[in-house]
Amino acid sequence: MQADKHAWKEVSPNLAQRPLVGVEKLLNYAEYYQNGNFQLSAAIHLETNLTTEKLQQRFGLAVWNVRCLLPEIGTWTVGTTGDAAVDLDNATFTAIQTVEEAQKWIDETAVIVQDGTTAEELTILTTNHTIEPAGKQFRVYLVTNARQGSPAIIVNASHVLSGHRIAAQLCTIVQALVDARLVSLLQAEPDPRAALRSIFVPENLARLIGKLPISLNTAYHKRFNPTEGDLENGFEKLSERLANSALPSIGIPRLSSPATNPEYSLGTVNGEAMTIMNLRRTIGSNEYRLLIDAHKKLGITVPSVIYACIVNSIDRRCKSNTAQDAETPGANLAYSAHAKRWLPDETFMTRSPVNMAIVLGSAYVSPDELRSKQHGCDLSIDELIELAKTIRAKQDAYLDTPHIISAMEQVGDEVSAMIADTAIKQRQAGTDPHVALFENSPAICPPTLTSQGDIAFKRLYTAQGGSWDPEPAVAAGEYVYIGHSWNSGRTTDASVCFALVGFSGELRLTSYFDSRFFDAKLIESILDDVLSNLRMIATTVPVDAPEAKL
């Protein structure tokens, strides 16, 4: 069976391995050869009655306990082959057998930051540096004694085997901090290292292997058992995507060459400018609810109207395109979709066997659909709404079959081979790494959007478990409440990624890019356009208007 080919297998008594498939493989090659491209950071502030001393005392053991529940945080995706060549084609998990190995893993994975650094500063640092050593999938920081702000936990993870699941990992760590068994253990033995020695049991690979994350392709084959016709249908979608990318398109222009002294940076570390930007716009919970209501009445979704606003702003502000001769450019939409639409159980955040569930989507908006006969690219609000409906219809048409997943394996194999071949040749030629990333990217970046949906999670944690309750005014016992939260990304190539996510009732639109390659002021303006148009659209809908059928 196809699914069995990609399953986890015990290759030695304490080592499990499986092939990386599709987008996983593509991301692993990009991360390795493109200086940590696509790596993620997610942060939560903690409101708690635990002292700093207790947080620090419990943190490492809490993360160790989470590994027992979610062994994915111990996976690796860079290894070596028998001839010592680098292996980027497999994920591995090594079951820890000694308490010394366990303590080493804790020391390298659960890091306490207590030098005054704030959570916001630390996320800037994590997004501006690649995770070391290469292939490590997960590291988590506890920020205490910050110059300002409450304590915080920040996960810095590879995107290869992570996505929505990071929220579940964070919540599980928070729960572990107030777990009654951990509290009792440290009351009896206050030294965390001694406490670990008193409870350590070697990991049982046979027990853990069933909890390790499977590939999206494995889940797809198990669920749908595709026929030859189904697989052909998937490759037709791939052909459509390639055809769309060849059509003349608007986009965000990169600079003429990588900036050696970027105008916009977030400071320097060890003499190196921090130029990985995460420009963010946040819509609060009250306004977000109004937006959702308005869009339901208009018969559009929030992601589709945001995408329309991004596309229109790029069309108005950026005069660059890939058109030749007398061609009029449309818009090639390069976006990611989540496979939960086809595999809801397999990709469910808190019990998901599939952690990387991204599918590459595509659509092309023609010049006539993109612009108004009356207003050109200066669309009215009604015309923006029509553009949003057009984008939604095209996305629905492209994503009308789960068999698109079948083509992702070929995409992963071909793109990863291309990434490796190009990077190796450039390294052999002595090309500057930033110049290499610049040269490997298109002259313009087509309109992108990755919409991650609304991520809801319990925010109050006590020894009794997690709940949806608000932070208590007076607590009967220990608690940790998840306050402000945000996510960040690392985009190292010459592309601009717009990411949309709902967190705790708020809506956040973030743009990830490197200011060595793009004008940060231009991208700020695009974000401002989106926010302004969103608000104008919401105000055009009467309060008593009925909902439209989507």
From Swiss-Prot:
MELs not only have high potential as eco-friendly biosurfactants due to their excellent surface activity, but also have attracted considerable recent interest because of thei runique properties, including self-assembly, anti-tumor and cell differentiation induction activities, and moisturizing and hair-repairing properties. The C-terminal PTS1-type tripeptide peroxisomal targeting signal is required for the import into peroxisomes. It is an enzyme of class 2 (transferase). Acyl-CoA-dependent acyltransferase; part of the gene cluster that mediates the biosynthesis of mannosylerythritol lipids (MELs), surface-active substances that enhance the availability of water-insoluble substrates. Mannosylerythritol lipid production is responsible for hemolytic activity of Ustilago maydis. GO terms for molecular function: acyltransferase activity. The keyword Acyltransferase applies. Pathway: Secondary metabolite biosynthesis. It is found in: Peroxisome. Disruption phenotype: Abolishes completely the production of mannosylerythritol lipids (MELs). Disulfide bonds: none annotated. One of its GO terms (cellular component) is peroxisome. This is Acyl-CoA-dependent acyltransferase MAC2. Residues 548-550 are annotated as: Peroxisomal targeting signal type 1.
